[in-house]
Regions:
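Conserved small/polar residues in nucleotide/adenosyl-binding loops
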Residues: 1-2
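Conserved active-site-proximal phosphate/metal-binding subdomains
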Residues: 9-144
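Short hydrophobic "strand-cap" motifs at the C-terminus of beta-strands
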Residues: 5
């Protein structure tokens, strides 16, 4: 079974993936901007406000790449390490004395609504999201 993930935004993307041989698709960012998503209103609004040029590839503390919205947290990382005050022991290979930031703290900040001091992971098409919708409406849009 082949599942296509990443870059799926609308029905045309789903059709294209299936035409290329995918058995299904995985969609993430579109569902963040739904009423049912438990992210804070500020987190969802960051998605709505995002432009394509706000997306930056960053490295996790253990070197894995990911797309994130450029904010005060990311700008600070560009210039310096963000000291870690508490280790959550979430990653075996993480050394709090050496890594540039604590990913757990950054994610907690963002989910709680501190979008300036948090890490807001997103998909490549986040700049195309322009409203908060419902899961029902989104599923209808993707399937009809």
């Amino acid at each position: 079974m082949y599942k296509r993930q990443g870059g799926i935004f609308d029905k045309q993307d789903i059709i294209h993936a299936i035409n290329l041989g995918a058995d299904g698709v995985q969609i993430a960012s579109r569902f963040v901007a739904t009423k049912e998503c438990d992210a804070s209103p500020a987190y969802k609004q960051a998605y709505i406000n995002a432009r394509q040029e706000d997306v930056q590839i960053i490295q996790s503390p253990v070197g894995m790449p990911g797309r994130a919205l450029r904010n005060a947290f990311i700008k600070q990382l560009d210039n310096s390490r963000i000291p870690i005050s508490k280790c959550y022991n979430c990653l075996e290979k993480c050394n709090p004395a050496k890594v540039p930031y604590c990913i757990t703290k950054a994610l907690i900040n963002a989910v709680k609504g501190d979008v300036d001091n948090g890490l807001i992971f997103c998909g490549a098409n986040v700049g195309r999201i322009n409203e908060i919708t419902t899961v029902h409406s989104l599923m209808k849009e993707l399937s009809e």
